[in-house]
Swiss-Prot record:
Pfam families: Crystall
Name this protein carries in UniProt: Beta-crystallin B2
Gene: Crybb2
Any one GO BP annotation for this protein: camera-type eye development
Subunit structure: Homo/heterodimer, or complexes of higher-order. The structure of beta-crystallin oligomers seems to be stabilized through interactions between the N-terminal arms.
SMART domains: XTALbg
Organism this protein belongs to: Rattus norvegicus (Rat)
Length: 205
C-alpha cells in the first residue's frame, strides 16, 4: 500500500501550500502562517514582511495589496531578508500572496516579438533559458502563450530583474503578465517540491 504522502508510482504528492511571514529579518518578531491566498497582509495584523519561510510551495507575492505591482516568486526554502526574494531591489514591500498551482510535468512556452502573438517567436520545451541572446533571440517579448507548465520570466539575463509569473494561458501583450515594458530576457520552469537553500533562484555559476 502507498503511504500517506506517496502515490502508487512512489512519487510524493504535493503538500498543501504553507508559508510563514515574519515581520523582521532572519525569521524574528511577529509571524503569520498562510495556507491560501492573502489579498492584504496588513489585514492579518502584519505591519511588514521582513523574512519569509516557505514550507510547501510555490507561491507568488506582490508589492501591493490585491495581487498588484511587482511580483516575487517563492519556492520552498528560506528568505531571510527582502533582497533574497528580489534582484530588482526596487521595493521591499510585500503586501499580498497566493499559492501557485503546479499541475503539469510538461513545460511548453512560446514568446512573441509583437502583441497578439505576431512577429518573431521563440518556443521553449522542458528547458530553462538563462539568456535569450545566447539562443539567438534578440527581440522584445510583447506577448506570451503558455501551453503547459508554469514559468517565471525575468527582465534581464541570468534570472535577474523584475519577475513575471507565467501560468498556463495567453498573454496578448506585456501588460497582461505585469511587465511595464516588452522586455523578458530569461525564463525558467517552476517545478513543485524544489528546494532552494538560499531562497531566491540562483543559477549555478
Amino acid at each position: 500500500m502507498a503511504s500517506d504522502h506517496q502515490t502508487q508510482a512512489g512519487k510524493p504528492q504535493p503538500l498543501n501550500p504553507k508559508i510563514i511571514i515574519f515581520e523582521q529579518e532572519n525569521f524574528q518578531g511577529h509571524s503569520h502562517e498562510l495556507s491560501g491566498p492573502c489579498p492584504n497582509l496588513k489585514e492579518t495584523g502584519m505591519e511588514k514582511a521582513g523574512s519569509v519561510l516557505v514550507q510547501a510551495g510555490p507561491w507568488v507575492g506582490y508589492e501591493q495589496a490585491n495581487c498588484k505591482g511587482e511580483q516575487f516568486v517563492f519556492e520552498k526554502g528560506e528568505y531571510p531578508r527582502w533582497d533574497s526574494w528580489t534582484s530588482s531591489r526596487r521595493t521591499d514591500s510585500l503586501s499580498s500572496l497566493r499559492p501557485i498551482k503546479v499541475d503539469s510535468q510538461e513545460h511548453k512556452i512560446i514568446l512573441y516579438e509583437n502583441p497578439n502573438f505576431t512577429g518573431k517567436k521563440m518556443e521553449i520545451v522542458d528547458d530553462d533559458v538563462p539568456s535569450f541572446h545566447a539562443h539567438g533571440y534578440q527581440e522584445k517579448v510583447s506577448s506570451v502563450r503558455v501551453q503547459s507548465g508554469t514559468w517565471v520570466g525575468y527582465q534581464y539575463p541570468g534570472y535577474r530583474g523584475l519577475q513575471y509569473l507565467l501560468e498556463k494561458g495567453d498573454y496578448k501583450d506585456n501588460s497582461d503578465f505585469g511587465a511595464p515594458h516588452p522586455q523578458v530576457q530569461s525564463v525558467r520552469r517552476i517545478r513543485d517540491m524544489q528546494w532552494h537553500q538560499r531562497g531566491a533562484f540562483h543559477p549555478s555559476s
